[in-house]
């Protein structure tokens, strides 16, 4: 997805396959952005560092855990990050250190995107990774939601400081 011309800020979440963590982050953060009334200013998307699940919907367990908490992941389709994403997204946020390393190697030298760990925006979780729930149980998916809710609040606060004020 390419950011809309009207969006001031683009945020891209990245995990390994784009079926568990990053689509959950996309869905949760999109809901937070909507609740803040900033949907026309912040574009939210997700991708995988690898194309293992390109074209697939998010993991059914991720969808179920999200829906249980009031977040909708339907309509999302897995895709692999491309170099051009660094031109379109201001924040390219990794779910773990391995993906962060991959993104930093991939990032074009002239890119202005902020590449960081998503949990750097969660108070008390700086430098930590969102654990991959893929091979685990349902509680792992619930933990992912807890973590991305917290980081999303911090990220939204950070972005809000830099958004142009809307005149009403």
Set out the residue ranges of the language-model regions.
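Conserved active-site segments centered on acidic
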Residues: 1-88, 157-168
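Phosphate-binding/catalytic loops
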Residues: 3, 91, 97-168
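Hydrophobic beta-strand core positions in alpha/beta domains
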Residues: 13, 93-94
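Helix N-cap/beta->alpha junction signal
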Residues: 22, 96-97
